Every structure is written in structure tokens, then in C-alpha cells.
Amino acid sequence: LRKVLEQWIGIAPFAAHPGKIYPTDKMEAVVAELSRLHPSSRIFLFGGGERERAVLAQWEQRYANCLDASHLLGSLAQELVLMSHLDVMVSMDSSNMHLASLVGTRVVSVWGATHPCAGFMGWGQSTDDVVQVPMPCRPCSIYGNKPCQRGGYPCLTQISPADIARKVELILNV
């Protein structure tokens, strides 16, 4: 891997359960904002399922600095090497959060139905890099696999794309 004069940002917008997935349109707004703020950056997209790949392919087409890393690299070992070179990873409370953490990459983690106080933060990560909305019903699920009792996961929909982009900016501009 070669990285010269550009910042590398990872985006892992998916998770195994709905209570852990930030709305796709809002995450695309994060991608758009980071692309606008950092036009010379490289934004690597991570996600492996068929539906996920379709979304990532659309983003790759819309934003010139985006690449679907999971499709391009094809193996977990190669993804881990790439993750180790990122300046920052944006991830849901998901396996990608943990993988990026294990290779020493700082992670802006987005939390919905789950909560970092349950003990599932990425290894070595700081609560300063957590994006979440305080709600009395959280955590409603330790694993994010239970339906939202309020309907529609407001714990995720009330998170602003600007809040996520701001956290990334704080890290990139250090």
C-alpha cells in the first residue's frame, strides 16, 4: 500500500442487526460531506453482503474519491492491512469496528440500540470518538437484534450526519 499526501478514511456502514445500522441515506450524507471537505482524500468502503455491495457500488460511482475496498481486495487479510493504514474508520457497532481497533486504527463508532457501556467498545478506543444520542430506552438490546419498541430506531435516525462528520474532522485535523 502506498499513501502519499492524502488522508485515508474508512467507512463501514453496515452491521448484522437493524438496531445497529445507521440509515443508508444519512450515511451517504456523511460520505458526501467528507468527500466535499477532503476532495484529495481516499474513502474506502467496507461491507460484504449482496445488498451492501449494491449500496457501496452506487457510492463508488457518485463520489470520485470512494473505493469499495471489500470488493477490490477480496479477502479479510487484505482488508486488515488496508485498515491498518487508515487515518480514521467510521463504523457502526460491528465487526469492522473491532477489526479496525485491533489493527490500531482510530474509530468513530456509531451506536443505536446498543450502548458502549455494555462493554463492546472497540479495543483501545475512546468514548470521545463515540457518536450516539442519549435516550432513556437505550440500550434496548445488547446485541442490536431486538425490534425497536418505539418504532423506527430514533436512537439512530436522530443522529445527524454532521455530528459524525464533525467527529471525523476532529481526528483528521489534529
PLM regions with names:
Residues G10-A15:
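Short beta-strands and strand-loop turn motifs
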Residues L1, Q78-E79, H98, A118-F120:
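Short, flexible, glycine/charge-rich loop motifs used to bind or transfer phosphoryl groups or to couple energy/partner
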Residues T24-A113:
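Donor-binding and catalytic core of enzymes assembling or modifying cell-surface/extracellular glycoconjugates
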Residues A69, S101-V174:
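Nucleotide-sugar donor-binding patch of glycosyltransferase catalytic domains
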Residues L1-I9:
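Nucleotide-sugar donor-binding and catalytic loop/hinge architecture
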Residues P18-P23:
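Glycine/threonine-rich flexible loop motifs
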